[in-house]
């Protein structure tokens, strides 16, 4: 099993698909990485030679931010926006949609489950 960027890649899938298991690599970047590393995209992960795995690993390390580094950069960017106190930072802080979506209805994913109304307990019957 090939291990690249701290991720075990599935053995039976094509390397083009296997690379997408790494956080930060999608279809397009997987194709570019394989093109730069001079590896055929239809090769199964189990059929890769040690030299091909090394070339893929080096290409990713040199050209692409993946896994922990990418997650750290994204979280620092969000934290920076919140520290600035700009509109986007405030939206992040409040847990609301950041990119201009409506919130009167929808936005449930970002806002979380509905908070139900808390009703008052029924008043006791007046004593006669």
From Swiss-Prot:
Write out the entry's keywords from A to Z: Ribonucleoprotein, Ribosomal protein, RNA-binding, rRNA-binding, tRNA-binding
Q: Which Gene3D superfamilies match?
A: 1.10.8.50, 30s ribosomal protein s13, domain 2
Cellular component GO terms held in the UniProt record: cytosol; small ribosomal subunit
Please name the GO terms that the record assigns under molecular function.
rRNA binding; structural constituent of ribosome; tRNA binding
Tell me if rRNA-binding is a UniProt keyword of this record.
Answer: yes
> Where is this chain compositionally biased, Basic residues type?
95-118
Region of interest called Disordered, as start-end residue ranges on this chain: 95-128
Q: Name one GO biological process term.
A: translation
Which Pfam family is one of those matched by this entry? Ribosomal_S13
Superkingdom of this protein's organism: Bacteria
| PROSITE patterns (alphabetical) | RIBOSOMAL_S13_1, RIBOSOMAL_S13_2
Job description of the protein: Located at the top of the head of the 30S subunit, it contacts several helices of the 16S rRNA. In the 70S ribosome it contacts the 23S rRNA (bridge B1a) and protein L5 of the 50S subunit (bridge B1b), connecting the 2 subunits; these bridges are implicated in subunit movement. Contacts the tRNAs in the A and P-sites.
Q: Which NCBIfam families match?
A: uS13_bact
Which HAMAP family would you find in this protein's record?
A: Ribosomal_uS13 (MF_01315)
**How is the subunit organization of this protein annotated in UniProt?**
Part of the 30S ribosomal subunit. Forms a loose heterodimer with protein S19. Forms two bridges to the 50S subunit in the 70S ribosome.
Q: Which family does it belong to?
A: Belongs to the universal ribosomal protein uS13 family.
> Which PANTHER family does the UniProt entry name for this protein?
30S RIBOSOMAL PROTEIN S13/40S RIBOSOMAL PROTEIN S18 (PTHR10871), SMALL RIBOSOMAL SUBUNIT PROTEIN US13M (PTHR10871:SF1)
Q: What protein name is recorded for this chain? A: Small ribosomal subunit protein uS13
